[in-house]
Amino acid sequence: MGFIDGLLGNASTLSTAAVQEELAHILLEGEKVEAAFKLVRDLIVFTDKRLILVDKQGITGKKTEFQSIPYKSISRFSVETAGRFDLDSELKIWISGAELPAVSKQFKKDESIYDIQKVLAAVCM
């Protein structure tokens, strides 16, 4: 997927080596990026230890929030696919003890939601 897909809210797969380098300042020593997806400016990163959600804020994207969720804290997740009239897909992640989802991300109609679901299933099951 290209630049236009990213602007439209479609997630695209990123090079794990590039993300490893970009997030080197927050990764633990020996922690490896296993999969990464870009959604507009935000990142969904799966490492061998945790899920990292990168939320770039503001016009320039200089202000950045890094949300780290250890896999053992994820109690469940759901994926809602796009339909005929509702064109958005949605990913929700609950953490232990929470009634409401801790993470809710919307995607435009694309197939990458299935790839993200597969990675989540692999690390949480």
Swiss-Prot record:
SUPFAM superfamilies: PH domain-like. InterPro entries: PHb, PHb_sf. It holds the Pfam family bPH_1. It comes from the Bacteria. PANTHER family: BHLH DOMAIN-CONTAINING PROTEIN (PTHR35796:SF3), HYPOTHETICAL CYTOSOLIC PROTEIN (PTHR35796). This is Uncharacterized protein YjqA. It comes from Bacillus subtilis (strain 168). The lineage of its organism: Bacteria, Bacillati, Bacillota, Bacilli, Bacillales.
